[in-house]
Regions:
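C-terminal substrate-binding/active-site "lid" region of AdoMet-derived donor-dependent transferases
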Residues: 81-149
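Short, well-ordered coil/turn elements that cap or connect secondary structure elements
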Residues: 19, 45-47, 65, 94, ...
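Conserved protein kinase catalytic core
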Residues: 8, 34, 60-62, 80, ...
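Active-site segment flanking the S-adenosylmethionine/decSAM binding pocket
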Residues: 49-107
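SAM cofactor-binding core of SAM-dependent methyltransferases
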Residues: 1-58
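Hydrophobic packing residues within well-ordered alpha-helices of enzyme cores
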Residues: 14, 37, 61, 83-87, ...
Length: 149
């Protein structure tokens, strides 16, 4: 699952590396972004590996009827925690699911509650990885990678 499709860049990268039988469900609330992503994914020849869904995560998540082994969160930073909790309560993420939260370094001030949940709730084993922001040598960002217990 990808929360935040934008133009499909991450969807192309993720779907090009997943197993043959796997599929990425990518959710975005912006219809224009979905249209651009659809073109990019099609151009990459990966349209059979990506299911694009238009709507907010809080609308779409309750409709999902599968378990995810990987979740990439890269949408509105204030929604990271609430959407993660929704995935938990809907039992979409179970033991050993990897949750990859992007851009938590440059938005760290908005991430305190998210960090507290994945680091201290006992539900996850979590680690933060810092690196230079893509295409910017002077700005650092981070990702938080959490494995569901």
């Amino acid at each position: 699952i990808e929360l935040g499709t934008f133009i499909g860049y991450s969807a192309v990268l993720i779907s090009s590396t997943i197993e043959e039988k796997s599929k990425l469900t990518s959710i975005d609330s912006d219809s224009h972004s979905i249209e651009i992503a659809k073109e990019l994914i099609n151009f990459a020849g990966l349209d059979d590996k990506v299911n694009l869904m238009h709507g907010s995560a809080e609308e779409i998540i309750p409709e999902l009827n599968f378990n995810a082994d990987f979740v990439f969160i890269d949408h509105a930073k204030k929604k990271y925690l609430s959407d993660l909790k929704l995935l938990e309560t809907q039992e979409i993420i179970l033991k050993n699911c990897t949750v990859f939260a992007d851009n938590v370094g440059i938005f760290k001030d908005e991430m305190a509650e998210y960090f507290d949940h994945v680091r201290n709730s006992g539900k996850y084993q979590s680690q933060n990885f810092s690196s230079k922001l893509e295409y910017r040598n002077n700005i650092y960002d981070a990702v938080e990678i959490s494995i569901k217990n």
